[in-house]
């Protein structure tokens, strides 16, 4: 059951990434058709913008991310138990030892960053280290190490970049169309087929950004499920992960502001969104995550 869930989550992520590229291609073609009169040019331009966005975000420094989240690097002497658990999980996962950081905050949370295992880092709050027992902490660190091993940070970064590219292209296309930069009417002897293409293009401009955001959220949620399952694969202790999630669910929001890009990295929502805002949350509900672990 465990390996079936891991394989299923990986397949779903691949499908969602394909859908993402289709969305990017569709919005590019729509803008190209409406503004430039050439859907081929718009399609190619959109893909180029998407790749540039993704590459620039992937190579963001680990130190920058840690600084944005008020994390400080610690040594084995400063936090031996925490350091050794990270070391153990990395060894079992067969990845290089990540750098180890602590965030001074009473809330219970942790995150990992790095575009590849060789430059990865793990951070945990002081609150989490104080409250979790060893089995629970192994579950949390196993979750973060799994993100590193599965290249989840890179995948999530690509998803954010593609969503940003779709929104940017849609915004530019809408403004150019609104302010008269659209296709010349003397070239538009519209027949039924052209009218359908025009309608599709306008709908793409309107709906693509929302669709891109929803796909990005779906990818992020699938990677969280995968990291939970992969953590159990490393620790062989589903109850430890379940107990950790139960404590995380009762945790207070973090004491310092966390931007949306960083919030997606954490094992638990650092802002504790409620109401309609929770619909656009990057993590699945903790109750659902616990339920999946219980059925392994």
UniProtKB/Swiss-Prot annotation:
Entry binding sites for Zn(2+): 143, 147, 224
Active site residues per record: 144
Pfam family, one: Peptidase_M48
UniProt GO MF annotations: metalloendopeptidase activity; zinc ion binding
Gene Ontology BP terms: proteolysis
Cofactor binding note of this UniProt entry: Binds 1 zinc ion per subunit.
TM segment ranges: 14-34, 39-59, 158-178, 195-215
Cofactor: Zn(2+)
Single GO cellular component term: plasma membrane
Enzyme Commission number(s) from the entry: 3.4.24.-
Keyword Methyltransferase recorded: no
Residue ranges the record marks as coiled coil: none
Major site of localization recorded for this protein: membrane
Compartment annotation: Cell membrane
Protein topology in the membrane: Multi-pass membrane protein
Key words, A-Z: Cell membrane, Hydrolase, Membrane, Metal-binding, Metalloprotease, Protease, Transmembrane, Transmembrane helix, Zinc
Family under the similarity heading: Belongs to the peptidase M48B family.
Protein name as annotated: Protease HtpX homolog
Species per Swiss-Prot/TrEMBL record: Streptococcus agalactiae serotype V (strain ATCC BAA-611 / 2603 V/R)
Name of the coding gene: htpX
